[in-house]
C-alpha cells in the first residue's frame, strides 16, 4: 500500500439505483440468477503512438496544440480551465489523423500540456512523439471491470 487513501488498485466503485428497492424486488422474485462478470484489463497499444505539437503565437497570445486525441474539445476545456488557467478561446486543439486509439487517446496527458507550455517558454514549436514501447506503461489501460 502506497497511500492510506488508496489501499488497492480499485479506481472507483460505482453504485447505482435504490438498493432497498432492488433487494425487495429480488426477495419477491420467483427465480433469481446470480452472475459475476469479469472484463479483463487490456492495453490499447495502437500502431500509431500518441504525438503532440505545441505552438505559441506571441502576436495572438494564444496556443495551438496538434494532438492525436479522440476528444479534442474536452482536452481543450481541461487544459485551458484546469491546467494553464486560460480562457478556452486562447487554446486551439486540432486532432488531425488520430490513428488507432481504442480509448487510450481520449485522455489529457502530461506530454500534451508540456509541449504547449514549452512552446511559449522557448518561442518555438515543440514536438513530442511517444515510442510504442512506452505506451505500455504511460497510456491509460482499458477496462478491467468486475461486475457482481
What name fits each language-model region?
Residues 1-148:
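Structural alpha/beta core scaffold segments of enzyme domains
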Amino acid at each position: 500500500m502506497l497511500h492510506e487513501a488508496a489501499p488497492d488498485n480499485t479506481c472507483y466503485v460505482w453504485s447505482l439505483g435504490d438498493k432497498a428497492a432492488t433487494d425487495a424486488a429480488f426477495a419477491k422474485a420467483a427465480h433469481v440468477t446470480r452472475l459475476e462478470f469479469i472484463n479483463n484489463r487490456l492495453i490499447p497499444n495502437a500502431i500509431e503512438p500518441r504525438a503532440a505539437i505545441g505552438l505559441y503565437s506571441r502576436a495572438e497570445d494564444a496556443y495551438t496544440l496538434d494532438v492525436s486525441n479522440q476528444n479534442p474539445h474536452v482536452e481543450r476545456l481541461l487544459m485551458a480551465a484546469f491546467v494553464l488557467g486560460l480562457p478556452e478561446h486562447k487554446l486551439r486543439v486540432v486532432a488531425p489523423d488520430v490513428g488507432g486509439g481504442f480509448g487510450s487517446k481520449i485522455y489529457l496527458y502530461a506530454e500534451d500540456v508540456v509541449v504547449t507550455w514549452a512552446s511559449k517558454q522557448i518561442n518555438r514549436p515543440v514536438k513530442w512523439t511517444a515510442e510504442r514501447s512506452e505506451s505500455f506503461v504511460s497510456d491509460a489501460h482499458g477496462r478491467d471491470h468486475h461486475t457482481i
